Amino acid sequence: MEELQGYLEKDRSRQQHFLYPLLFQEYIYALAHDYGLNGSIFYESAEVFGYDNKSSLALVKRLITRIYQQKSLIYLVNDSKQNRFVGHTHNNFFYSRFYSQMISESFSIIVEIPFSLRLVSYLKEKEIPKYHNLRSIHSIFPFLEDKLSHLNYVSAILIPHPIHMEILVQILQCWIQDVPFLHLLRFFLHEYHNWNSFLITQKKSIFVFSKEKKRLFRFIYNFYVFECEFLFVFIRKQSSYLRLTFFGTFFERTHFYGKIEHLQIEKLIVICRNDFHRTFWFFKDPFMHYVRYQGKAILASKGTHLLMTKWKYHFVNFWQYYFNFWSQPYRIQINQLSNYSFYFLGYLSSLLINSSAVRNQMLENSFIIDTLTKKFDTIVPVILLIGSLSKAKFCTISGHPISKPIWANLSDSDILDRFGRICRNLFHYHSGSSKKQGLYRIKYILRLSCARTLARKHKSTVRTFLRRLGSGLLEEFFTEEEEVLSLMFPKTTSFTLHGSHRERIWFLDIIRINELVNRS
């Protein structure tokens, strides 16, 4: 444990001591606005309550003045909890929520500064100029295609969640030593009304974020996951040292470092040979492969089930030591890749094993060679996608298309554009599927839901509406996949209807998962 502590301290040499004074700088609130607050209460509420957007600078100055007054700062968020119709005037309710949102978003910008600087220095050190290409979600799947076919076991991991938010403050304190700033963080976590929405259920391992303070809570959760992975890096580096030295096979590798230090390797091999009456070959520790998205992760290896079990309890023990809470072992499930399929990033992935027989003729003798090939397979979980469409009110739970009443007041072009965009995005995201027939069922649901929505708007039936305008009206907005591929690739490359079902294409411009895919 002392070695772990020393390893952690080496990587935390840059600690920020002066972040709290940044809250009193006006440009921080301008940065918060530029980072995408146009769709939040920062400005939308000003329009709703009748305030002009130009008064935001004056409100920021008024907020900074109130921050200097400690009592005003303490009651600032508490005022936003109250209902504006009970004992609060129209102005007080707006000011309290407006100030609360400005502090929360600006706090998020400030707390990200030390980690942004650390990322920039890392990219310069590693000479990675175009790191944004690595942000694509689809970049994970070519990696899995290349690696998983050679591995044996995979551990499905649910990232554990802390019991108390004070744990998050304590691990953040290792990076930031500005005491007033950390006190303000505690204030956010314990006093905000939106704290009630900052939960983790037993079925899910990710936070349900508040809409108003989504950026702050997302940062805290991502930082916590980063710390969980930080322990994995430490364990992985310790394990990688073994690959530098050849060693004999030990059925029980307890106190392995002590045995190597105090005993001769040759003597240990002799002991093993005498006990098990066989000669053991030297070997290296197998490589481990780790991939994570949101609150789920997979750890794959070419090793044995015993090795994966030891890794499992390494994770559990280190999490308990470092975060001071009980981590249930059932959150890490070990499975054999050949008999296991896992849901990851909107795909149902598995390892297919195909056998082929080859007849070999040598002079007068012939024999048959059986060859096994492994292939990483990804298919679209149609049932889960239909469930997502059902939650979004595009169809029933059984997949029967229904109209979207909330969109009936839009123009025809807007309705067609929204349905067409959803359909194209789903086809774009699931372009890596090995079987795309299920996507055409999703396309049928969206097309008929669009037709029902338009018919509802014009107070007509679907058949009458399509007969009057023609079914070709929907074809323009639901672009076929073959047409999209023909625009992306040279004309010499032919994509037939049959081939498009098998062709897998991964895009490196997808930096976030589709909302409908994420719901499934």
From Swiss-Prot:
Top-level lineage group: Eukaryota
Matching Pfam families: Intron_maturas2, MatK_N
CC terms in the record's Gene Ontology section: chloroplast
GO BP terms, alphabetized: mRNA processing; RNA splicing; tRNA processing
InterPro entries: Domain_X, Maturase_MatK, Maturase_MatK_N
Keywords: Chloroplast, mRNA processing, Plastid, RNA-binding, tRNA processing
Role: Usually encoded in the trnK tRNA gene intron. Probably assists in splicing its own and other chloroplast group II introns.
HAMAP family the record matches: MatK
Family: Belongs to the intron maturase 2 family. MatK subfamily.
Listed name of the protein: Maturase K
Organism: Galanthus elwesii (Giant snowdrop)
